[in-house]
């Protein structure tokens, strides 16, 4: 079907006579119908990828690309005087995720569909997502982020289940979003909602009655957990998700002929982080309800469930108080106790018990009763095996494996950077769109001046696009000829946005002293801080204060500017990543499981400035030392220092004059004049007296390496070679490769 026919059928108009809104909804209808007409992935055995988050981003352009009609639609629009970019702006971004965990899940379902595998994503249909971030007086404020409209991507199904909590029962409803594979088949994102959800209990902020479960259950992703009511609500949410998922799994297996004793032949469950962990006892409970005895039910579930660990941070491995579960899901506690008793009967190491110190350890349950445990980057998996989960690795060495994360090149190159995609196709053909390893062929052009010039021109165009977009959206005045130095990711101390901010202060002082950079520098930040994460919000406050001070200083702003984008999301990422020159991946070594932003930037020709952490290690191995800028202490040094417990941040502060000057500036009159003294002093004291993620030991190395990167940028031809090497080596990080490995080594769907 053509767009002209679609708008004629819907509005009885020509494209020229339609508004952009009308064209958008006609395109939405057309693509939904085309997706429904595609053959769904099928097979006896099915994967259920259960995740609390799916950060899918806007769907229109990605679906048009995967359906193979993007260029045709773009041409039709242009012939009628319309701009596809303006049409895309109308779409609201689904508020179904937050950070890398959710974006990974979204990339994975895209690859599952593209590879023709029989698998669905399963999660919750959040109405307001995490929150919409707004800046007010240099502070983060949180407001609801609605996205659901009557005419949208969600399709209401007839599937509904009663879900029993302690003292009351709620009714669920399943909504589907079709996930379109690239020139292939489709799969589904299956999102459960509560029938009694009530958006009216939310006002202009994200505050609401956390105890009214029947109205609030699916309103927000990760409700504020700074109080017990918020933490308890998370338990209700997680059980609601897995209870519905478990029933769906059993119903679909039975419909295909399973007697449930053979469930492992019909279903495999990937537990994405610890949020869906209760699916293990819930499946055991439901199998017992259907007549299977406890012993066999446990054996069946242990052959069905697999667990992905996404973190090295102990606080992120969920542990719920027993009394939470006894209140919210009392029917699960006898099963969880039985699972724990069986562990105790065969294992003497108390640190591996499921129930310990009045807490239920979700990851422990996943490891004992899952058939696979995987990390998400080589370094991460090695740290799990040798350190963080070593006690479990000794018990089950055969369960542990690595699956380095990946990204979908459809969204993160073809959709967000069509100019670079076209250049690549002109050089090596379009086989790379299906087999990302073909990007290696670009290595043949590293000494071709015409190719390097074109690559620089593509980058310059994307930088101009970002400048214009951010000027339109947020009023930023950006020098498109400056170095675009970008750090965009969830705000967390281990990701060390605070170290980047300290460098900005250091550079500010250098410029004030007359040491001006050869090329102007624009430092971009984008990050949301969890509402209850006070220090993270203080870091945002500092960055916004620096933005105000530096950008309004006529002595400094011609050489250095700072911009923090508001409400960073997938849509903004798709604008920023293609424009980036230097990708900041500066987490404390040993703390970032993998990262996927590093891969997206690399694919779009940015050079990584990073620690040897997460997937940075594999990027460095692929591109070589000349094509990445690494700094900082190695992971083992960091792990050893934590083990000794002898880190003293103040000692670094007192012996490093550059560091001392930068840290002191946080509480200077200059910053306090545009900021809040309480927030700034709290951050200052946190760094000076704690600095838990060791910003100070890496600071000198960071300055030195960042200056090397800026110096290297001046040789444009040599820089372009480094860009091309990075793009040519990015094929390994395709989520198609990751999912193929999951399937061959864990799921075994076909």
Report the location of each language-model feature:
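A conserved ligand/cofactor-binding region detector
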Residues: 1-750
């Amino acid at each position: 079907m053509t767009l002209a026919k679609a708008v004629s059928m819907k509005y009885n108009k020509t494209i020229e006579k339609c508004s952009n809104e009308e064209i958008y909804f006609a395109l939405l209808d057309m693509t939904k119908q085309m997706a429904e007409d595609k053959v769904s992935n099928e097979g006896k055995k099915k994967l259920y990828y259960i995740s609390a988050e799916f950060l899918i981003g806007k769907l229109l352009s990605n679906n048009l690309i995967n359906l193979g009609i993007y260029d045709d639609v773009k041409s039709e629009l242009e012939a009628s005087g319309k701009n596809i970019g303006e049409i895309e702006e109308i779409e609201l971004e689904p508020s179904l995720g937050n950070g890398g965990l959710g974006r990974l899940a979204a990339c994975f379902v895209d690859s599952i569909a593209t590879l023709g595998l029989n698998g669905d994503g399963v999660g919750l249909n959040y109405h307001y997502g995490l929150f919409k971030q707004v800046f007010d007086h240099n502070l983060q404020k949180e407001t609801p982020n609605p996205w659901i409209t009557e005419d949208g991507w969600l399709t209401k199904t007839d599937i509904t289940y009663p879900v029993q909590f302690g003292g009351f029962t709620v009714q669920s409803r399943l909504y589907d979003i079709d996930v379109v594979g690239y020139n292939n088949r489709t799969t589904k994102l299956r999102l459960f909602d509560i029938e009694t959800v009530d958006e009216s209990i939310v006002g202009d902020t994200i505050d609401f009655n956390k105890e009214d479960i029947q109205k609030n259950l699916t309103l927000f992703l990760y409700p504020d957990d700074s109080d017990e009511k918020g933490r308890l609500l998370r338990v209700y949410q997680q059980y609601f998700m897995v209870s519905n998922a478990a029933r769906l799994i059993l119903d679909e297996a039975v419909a295909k002929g399973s007697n449930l004793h053979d469930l492992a032949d019909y279903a495999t469950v990937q537990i994405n982080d610890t949020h869906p962990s209760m699916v293990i006892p819930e499946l055991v409970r439901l199998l017992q309800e259907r007549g299977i005895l406890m012993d066999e039910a446990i054996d069946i579930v242990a052959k069905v469930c697999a667990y992905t660990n996404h973190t090295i941070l102990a606080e992120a491995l969920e542990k719920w108080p027993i009394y939470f579960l006894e209140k919210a899901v009392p029917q699960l506690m006898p099963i969880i106790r039985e699972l724990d008793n069986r562990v105790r009967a065969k294992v003497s190491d108390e640190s591996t018990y499921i129930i310990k110190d009045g807490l239920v350890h979700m990851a422990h349950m996943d490891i004992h009763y899952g058939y696979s445990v995987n990390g998400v980057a080589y370094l991460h998996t090695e740290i799990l095996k040798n350190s963080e989960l070593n006690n479990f690795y000794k018990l089950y060495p055969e369960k542990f494996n690595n699956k380095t994360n990946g990204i979908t090149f459809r969204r993160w190159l073809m959709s967000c950077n069509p100019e670079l995609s076209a250049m690549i196709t002109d050089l090596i053909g379009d086989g790379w769109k299906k087999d990302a390893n073909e990007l290696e062929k670009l290595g043949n052009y590293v000494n071709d001046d015409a190719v390097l010039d074109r690559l620089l021109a593509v980058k310059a165009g994307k930088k101009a696009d970002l400048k214009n977009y951010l000027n339109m959206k947020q009023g930023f005045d950006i020098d498109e000829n400056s170095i675009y130095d970008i750090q965009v990711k969830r705000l967390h101390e281990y990701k060390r946005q605070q170290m980047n901010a300290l460098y900005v202060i250091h550079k500010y002082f250098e410029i004030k002293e007359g040491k001006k950079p050869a090329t102007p520098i624009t430092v971009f930040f984008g990050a949301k801080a969890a509402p209850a994460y006070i220090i993270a919000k203080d870091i945002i406050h500092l960055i916004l204060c620096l933005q105000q001070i530096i950008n309004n200083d006529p002595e400094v702003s011609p050489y250095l500017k700072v911009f923090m984008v508001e409400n960073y999301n997938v849509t903004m990422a798709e604008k920023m990543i293609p424009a980036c020159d230097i990708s900041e991946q500066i987490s404390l070594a040993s703390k970032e499981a993998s990262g996927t932003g590093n891969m997206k930037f690399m694919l779009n020709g940015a050079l990584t400035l990073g620690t040897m952490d997460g997937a940075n290690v594999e990027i460095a191995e692929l591109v070589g030392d000349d094509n990445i800028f690494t700094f900082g202490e190695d992971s083992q040094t960091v792990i050893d220092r934590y083990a000794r417990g002898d880190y003293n941040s103040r000692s670094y502060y007192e012996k490093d004059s550059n560091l001392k000057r930068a840290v002191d500036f946080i509480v200077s009159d200059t910053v306090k004049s545009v900021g809040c003294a309480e927030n700034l002093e709290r951050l200052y004291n946190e760094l000076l007296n704690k600095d838990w993620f060791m910003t100070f030991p890496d600071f000198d190395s960071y300055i030195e390496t960042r200056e090397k990167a800026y110096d290297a940028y001046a040789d444009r031809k040599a820089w372009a070679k480094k860009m091309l090497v990075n793009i040519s080596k990015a094929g390994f990080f395709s989520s198609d490769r990751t999912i193929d490995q999951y399937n061959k080594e864990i799921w075994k769907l076909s």
